[in-house]
A protein has these predicted regions:
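Proline-centered turn/helix-capping motifs that create local helix->coil transitions or kinks
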Residues: 83-89, 187-201, 265-269, 308-313, ...
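Short coil/turn linking the two alpha-helices of tandem helical-hairpin repeats
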Residues: 163-164, 235, 242, 356
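Hydrophobic/aromatic-rich effector regions of fungal transcription factors
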Residues: 154, 158-165
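Non-catalytic C-terminal accessory modules of carbohydrate-active enzymes
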Residues: 359-509
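Active-site core of glycosidic bond-cleaving carbohydrate-active enzymes
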Residues: 102-139, 152, 177-180, 184, ...
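The feature captures the catalytic groove of carbohydrate-active enzymes
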Residues: 9-43, 143-150, 187-255, 286
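Acidic/His metal-coordination segments adjacent to aromatic residues that form catalytic metal sites
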Residues: 94, 133-145, 202-220, 382-396
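Acidic/polar, glycine-enriched structural segments that form the non-catalytic walls/loops
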Residues: 1-103, 169-171, 182-185, 238-239, ...
Length: 510
């Protein structure tokens, strides 16, 4: 039988099909090339599309893990990012999403570009940075979202980290005018915040947009966190290339940090066990719980690295996040007060990792993965299972590729992480990746010291593991640290060396 149409509402047309319909192909086309197609043509298209994507030169195999599902999500994350990529003016531009997030967001782009650089695609990431820099305003600042002062600090971080990951100090020197200008912007913003010396934000940042669960223009801390992190990155960059500005910028950072600590002490609120937490808003609203908007705090922990591991404020805010979990992720920190911001899991996991809790970071990785779709993609935010009473309550694009980048970043950093002049290996290795014959590998993954390769193989009887690490050649790398968790049995670890490759025979708890 034939199908018929039924109007079911304004701007809506429903197709009603006969009961005996077994197969259906839907083909949407427009323009002079549109035409009728057959069912056999439609059946062939999924295979042709899949084959096309398989033939692309994408960095699959750079990160290899023994959990098949996690590997599929990793590969999907790489593919998601490339499927949303566009070529503009001859340059590859990585888009955050395909529809409502198809555009330039500085913080999203920062971590997408970092993830791709990890995977050996530094040239493509650099093109994305060049595109980003075209959005610098006439006054030298970045203000794409409006009073989103943190964009300036984020760009400083991007420039510094990209130079480290690619080992290209000449590129950093070529961008030094931009670095110098952005440090000046941060100084200028701090001065503007002092117009009213009695204002809570005086000496920090003017009132601005928090994002990540908190709207409006407020005296708040997300812009403070990221501009502290950006200024710290500028200081480290100046030291790296021995720029004359290093001492002046370090003094500015010290003053900024001291002003922040004084304000944080004023605004901290009592929590459990004597802890003092810091809400994002300097004048908290009763309608906004302290857990809301804590994304930039997590970024300040890592990659910002502005807090020492034993900092009481950092420990208190982490306890706040720990106490607000649902399905293994932080609950109510984003735009949905009753929802889960899926890839906030990476921010949260990275903060735990940096503060020395690798096993918790590994747990968070799996909770993050458990919120992916069957095809390995994420919404930005969603309600916990069974709590979407209205139906269709979600936030963000689909797929949301910042999430894909964060999954790549978290897997990479659980396996290899830079700590100053040290390279730490297996600090957040999931225990479930250590079954008999399991293999975990990194292949020429970019680090601050150059590419690193790693191969961990568990023996057939599960009683030992062999680790091979090909160490980067940078003279800045002073120490290679291998983390042996509860999975390693007490006993002597046998070590040897073949050129730049270090070998470890590790006895395991069976």
């Amino acid at each position: 039988g034939a199908w018929r149409t039924s109007k079911t509402g304004k701007n809506r047309l429903t197709l009603v099909f006969p009961d005996d319909l077994a197969e259906l192909a839907v083909y949407c086309a427009s323009g002079h090339e549109a035409g009728e197609v057959g069912l056999e043509w439609a059946k062939a298209q999924p295979g042709l599309s899949a084959g096309w994507w398989r033939r692309r030169d994408f960095p699959y195999g750079t990160l290899s893990v023994p959990d098949r599902t996690m590997q599929e999500i990793l590969d999907s994350s790489i593919r998601n990012i490339y499927q949303a990529r566009e070529i503009k003016n001859g340059l590859p531009i990585f888009q955050v999403g395909p529809t409502c997030y198809r555009g330039l967001w500085v913080v999203d782009g920062c971590f997408i570009l970092e993830a791709m650089t990890y995977l050996g695609r530094g040239a493509e990431a650099r093109a994305g940075i060049d595109h980003l820099l075209t959005r610098q305003g006439p006054d030298g600042s970045f203000d794409i979202l409006g009073k989103y002062w943190k964009e300036n600090g984020i760009v400083l971080y991007i420039l510094y980290r990209h130079a480290l990951l690619t080992g290209d100090m000449e590129w950093l020197k070529a961008k030094w005018g931009t670095v110098r200008t952005l440090v000046g912007v941060i100084k200028r913003l701090r001065e503007a915040s002092r117009k009213n010396p009695a204002a809570p934000e005086a000496g920090l940042m003017p009132p601005g947009f928090s994002d990540g669960g908190i709207g409006g223009i407020n005296a708040e801390y997300t812009n403070v966190y990221w501009n502290l992190a950006g200024l710290r990155a500028a200081v480290e960059a100046a030291r790296l290339i021995q720029a004359p500005e290093a001492a002046d910028w370090e003094a500015e950072y010290s003053d900024f940090w001291a002003t922040f600590r004084k304000a944080a002490k004023r605004d901290a609120k009592p929590y459990r066990d004597g802890l003092m937490i810091l809400p994002v808003l300097m004048a908290p609203s009763p309608d906004i719980l302290p857990v809301r908007g804590q994304w930039a705090f997590c970024h300040a922990v890592f990659p910002g690295q502005i807090f020492e591991p034993d900092d009481p404020l950092a420990r208190a805010n982490m306890a706040l996040l720990d106490d607000n979990q649902s399905e293994g992720l932080v609950y109510g920190t984003g735009w949905m007060a009753n929802g889960i911001w899926n890839y906030f899991g990476s921010f949260y996991g990275h903060a735990h990792l940096w503060l020395g809790n690798g096993p918790k970071a590994a747990e968070v990785l799996y909770a993050f993965a458990n919120h992916a779709s069957p095809l390995g993609a994420w919404r930005e935010e969603q309600p916990p299972a069974g709590q979407d009473k209205k139906g269709g309550t979600f936030v963000g694009d689909m797929p949301h590729n910042w999430a894909s980048a964060e999954f790549i970043r978290l897997v990479r950093n659980l396996l290899v992480l830079e700590r100053g002049q040290e390279l730490h290996v297996l600090e957040g290795l999931p225990r479930s990746w250590l079954f008999a014959n399991a293999e975990t590998a990194l292949k020429d993954v970019a680090t601050d010291f150059g590419p690193v390769s790693l191969h961990l193989k568990v023996s057939a009887d599960g009683r030992s593991a062999t680790l091979a690490v090909t160490k980067p050649e940078s003279p800045r790398l002073k120490k290679l640290v291998v983390h042996l968790g509860a999975w390693a049995r007490e006993g002597k670890v046998l070590t040897s060396r073949e050129g730049r490759t270090y070998l470890f025979e590790i006895p395991m708890v069976k």
